[in-house]
Amino acid sequence: AQIKEATQLSASSYGLQPYKIIEIKDAQLKEQLKPLTWGQSQVTDASEFWAFCNKDVVTDEDVDTFTALRAKTTGTEVSALGGYSDFVKGKMKEKSESEMFNWTAKQTYIALGNALATAAELGVDATPMEGFEADQYNEALGLKEQGYITCVLLALGKRHEEDSYQH
């Protein structure tokens, strides 16, 4: 719970957090994903397995949703945040497709970094994983329809005492 909370509290540019984290709990889905992760055992063996997914594009609607949440959280009128909202929308529209992907991926990695730091602080082993077939992950997790792309994976748990990689 603490690791998840750390990712939810992660800083991000403009405060948008253009990503989501999917906790993959279903054993059958993990078995389906394992070959797409080049057979890495952490997919099925780790206590927890997460997919960090970044938005493929940040829309005006995304900014409006964020602005409404910010207004509610701070007790501010949405109209008072209109200037900021317009500024962010303008910045998002300036980005090319590749710039948008790179920017949202960087924001996602900030959250991953917080998850890794929190896991280390709690004594939980964490394995970030970039070795996977992203397009096939996107399909298996139904991400394209949601406007997300699998960015990086994270396996969490405690190592077996006899793990030969433990030092």
Predicted regions and their residues:
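Acidic, surface-exposed loops and disordered segments
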Residues: 1-167
